[in-house]
From Swiss-Prot:
This protein's record includes keyword Amino-acid biosynthesis: yes
Summary of the function given for this chain in its UniProt record: IGPS catalyzes the conversion of PRFAR and glutamine to IGP, AICAR and glutamate. The HisF subunit catalyzes the cyclization activity that produces IGP and AICAR from PRFAR using the ammonia provided by the HisH subunit.
Keywords: Amino-acid biosynthesis, Cytoplasm, Histidine biosynthesis, Lyase
Designated name of the protein: Imidazole glycerol phosphate synthase subunit HisF
Active site feature: 11, 130
Gene3D superfamilies, per database record: Aldolase class I
Underlying gene: hisF
GO molecular function: imidazoleglycerol-phosphate synthase activity; lyase activity
Similarity section: Belongs to the HisA/HisF family.
Pfam family name, one: His_biosynth
Species per Swiss-Prot/TrEMBL record: Paracidovorax citrulli (strain AAC00-1)
Amino acid sequence: MLAKRIIPCLDVTGGRVVKGVNFLELRDAGDPVEIAARYNGQGADELTFLDITATSDGRDLILPIIEAVASQVFIPLTVGGGVRTVEDVRRLLNAGADKTSFNSAAIANPEVIDAASAKYGAQCIVVAIDAKRRTPEEAARPGPDGAPRGEGWDVYSHGGRKNTGLDAVQWAAEMARRGAGEILLTSMDRDGTKSGFDLALTRAVSDAVSVPVIASGGVGGLDDLADGVQQGGADAVLAASIFHYGEYTVAQAKERMAARGIPVRL
């Protein structure tokens, strides 16, 4: 079994790392370059950098900050937020990113994943999916075939502001077919709540795709990370709050996972 990865996440807006609850109530967590260097030193397997307001603000990529972060880390760096085109992938790779993450742009134009993967390889194309469990009212609404949609999760775009009506599990499968090398799966219901991953969502997507799935949204303790792997079927686990505010270190997270029989790089 391959080692499971622990990935701290930097949600960035206005040049600062922030953390919210359910994608709202953002709280400052510090300077992205300093925080990235800290996680690099703690032994994180990878780092994810998400410009969380680039798409909703219609802004360009913040290349100077990305270059500064890339200069401080010697582990794979994934950058997302405002990635719209194959040309954006080139610009980010040149700025020091190892992988690029598409979200809203893939929803607007799914073919961009085919094109980016064909040009740069699936290994550097991540598709981020922000998913929210359907309300009973949403589940009762008819789907494309006229039957009630039923329980499940919908995909949201524009930083979690817009329900696309896409089914999260089906969307993940389509993105993998089109050439995504990895799925970054965030539960909006659990984001920042510290109540653990949405394991049913994680498992449903993990079972539907053959590419690695990164579980995100809801980590409150070290056992939540292990549960994401053992119960959710995730290949990697992403967390922010528990690391940013000093509750736990990456090393402690790896020790707990190893103690539960999960292979990690110590």
